[in-house]
Amino acid sequence: MQNSLPTQTYQSQLNEKTERLQKMMAPFNAPNVEVFSSPEQHYRMRAEFRIWHEQDALYHIMFDQETKQRIRVDQFPVASQLINQMMVALLAEIKDKPTLRHKLFQIDYLSTLSNKIIVSLLYHKKIDETWQQEATALRQTLIAQGFDVQLIGRAYKTKIMLDNDFVDEVLPVAGQQMIYRQVENSFTQPNAQVNIKMLEWALSVTENSTGDLLELYCGNGNFSLALARNFKRVLATEIAKPSVHAAQYNIAMNHIDNVKIIRMSAEDFTQAMNGVREFKRLEGINLQDYQCETIFVDPPRSGLDEKTVELVKNYSRILYISCNPQTLCQNLETLIKTHKISKLALFDQFPYTHHMECGVLLEKR
């Protein structure tokens, strides 16, 4: 599976997901599913591998989820071509360098469509200046081979970055080039081509919007920055510090002046909106000034908690992106009492797996 993909089954697995999603949504009177496919291979922009040492040899491995057996991975067609090229080049360079290979147990890759890559080397040992010198030489060698690479070393309570711990992605979204800073070890959408389709779908279903947009869990601003052109103003919340910093950078780089990011959890924001308590982080922002008629949510796999469901149902339109249709359905049992589903989409973020990413637009009855 890891060294080859059953590309001949791509369409049939997508059809099966489409039928499954349509059945799940039938109790909620959902319209027909709009389907957005993925490239059949080289679609995943990040990958993590354990490293196996066998005498002088060194190779990437993964573990079979059922048998737990290790699988040697020399090529990984799931991942971007850039990751595949780097996998080969990197191991060729470090296998003869004891400082770089000793107790190396994992390598993480994060690549972009803009042809940049971050490589994180994880060790079960202390890494120091000697490691840094060797890693710097390694990076220069890889740059000379044509790679635009950031190299990071990680060990217990240690992180050494040779230059930056981020890369800037450029995505073409509905005729505009959007710049997104992606930070190592922070969440980014794994399938860039499908992410573009998700952003364009969200833009199309919110065309001719009135009022402002509220977004919970905004990450690096992936959706809020793309959607800013459809709304007067956007107010977005995010809890993770690196993501908030990346979002602020992305706002500046994309010359967007109508988006405000607040660092707080969806739960705290719910309390602030309901006037339960005041928060220092909201100083200078009067929530009453915003006329948010649309709310956008892209929650974790667990879905929206009860209090957030109570918050979102107050909005005329709810745009909900879900990476777990089961928890979406649980939330819909409440939301369907006040709203109807006007749009339904399936995004094949994770081909050849049972995972489904979907989007619904709910409008007040």
From Swiss-Prot:
Enzyme Commission identifier(s)? 2.1.1.-, 2.1.1.35
Family annotation (Pfam families): tRNA_U5-meth_tr
Enzyme class, top EC level, equals: transferase
A GO MF annotation of the entry reads: tRNA binding
Name the GO cellular-component terms: cytosol
Check the record and name the InterPro entries matching this protein. MeTrfase_TrmA_AS, MeTrfase_TrmA_CS, SAM-dependent_MTases_sf, TrmA_MeTrfase, U5_MeTrfase_fam
Catalysed reactions, as listed in the record: uridine(54) in tRNA + S-adenosyl-L-methionine = 5-methyluridine(54) in tRNA + S-adenosyl-L-homocysteine + H(+); uridine(341) in tmRNA + S-adenosyl-L-methionine = 5-methyluridine(341) in tmRNA + S-adenosyl-L-homocysteine + H(+)
| Domain of life, source organism | Bacteria
TM ranges are none
Residues engaged in binding S-adenosyl-L-methionine: 189, 217, 222, 238, 298
* SUPFAM superfamilies given in the database record: S-adenosyl-L-methionine-dependent methyltransferases
Alphabetical keyword list: Methyltransferase, S-adenosyl-L-methionine, Transferase, tRNA processing
- The active-site annotation reads 323 (nucleophile), 357 (proton acceptor)
What are its GO biological-process terms? Answer: tRNA methylation
Q: Which residues form the signal peptide?
A: none
Q: Which PROSITE patterns match?
A: SAM_MT_RNA_M5U, TRMA_1, TRMA_2
Protein family according to the UniProt entry: Belongs to the class I-like SAM-binding methyltransferase superfamily. RNA M5U methyltransferase family. TrmA subfamily.
Which PANTHER family does UniProt cross-reference here? TRNA/TMRNA (URACIL-C(5))-METHYLTRANSFERASE (PTHR47790), TRNA_TMRNA (URACIL-C(5))-METHYLTRANSFERASE (PTHR47790:SF2)
Task: Outline what the protein does.
Answer: Dual-specificity methyltransferase that catalyzes the formation of 5-methyluridine at position 54 (m5U54) in all tRNAs, and that of position 341 (m5U341) in tmRNA (transfer-mRNA).
**Protein name (Swiss-Prot/TrEMBL):** tRNA/tmRNA (uracil-C(5))-methyltransferase
Name the source organism: Proteus mirabilis (strain HI4320)
